[in-house]
């Protein structure tokens, strides 16, 4: 029997949705183009390592070959279980041998059998047509900050969107030029049980605003 639109509206008025689900009977979906993703089992807790929570370390790279040796020296010493860590890199607008050096360092790390090798590694290449002087003064000058930050944001968005998987509980953004960091930094960060943690300091006071300056917080 066909219902008029008014009759159907009255029939389903007690429902929040016009679709009736029987939660006790599984619905078999045959189409291979439909992929369900259940994020409910994925948790982020203060006992991340004990609960075997996966961590994704993301690092954008641009003309970074000279930093990679130190980068891997530090990340190889991380005490968080490496079998729970995935690495992902985005290489953009690079003019040096960053890709070759990265590949060599990863090959060396991933061949190790002493627990240093990571669960997986992804290398993403995406150019944005952004060119910036490698001179420190130019890179950190006020005029360069808006286009530089815009390019950095685009690179990070591409990297996150490409590398993040449903099984990841945590994302750790790590710059390539860090020269020192605690070996337990992942455990320290997850122990705070916060959605987002950022540093609250500025070691480069700005002097461009009519004599005003931003001091360290």
Protein language model regions, located:
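N-proximal low-complexity "stem/linker" segments adjacent to membrane-targeting elements
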Residues: 1-77
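Short, acidic, metal-binding catalytic loop of nucleotide-sugar glycosyltransferases
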Residues: 50, 73-84, 94, 104-112
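Mobile, glycine-rich extracellular loop/lid and propeptide segments
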Residues: 59-64, 105, 171-172, 186-187
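Catalytic phosphate/metal-binding cores of nucleic-acid and nucleotide-processing enzymes, i.e., regions
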Residues: 69-71, 105-106, 153-161, 178-179, ...
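Active-site-proximal specificity loops/subdomain of glycosyltransferases
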Residues: 97-168
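Conserved catalytic core of nucleotide-sugar-dependent glycosyltransferases
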Residues: 160, 178-217
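The conserved acidic donor/metal-binding loop of glycosyltransferases
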Residues: 170-179
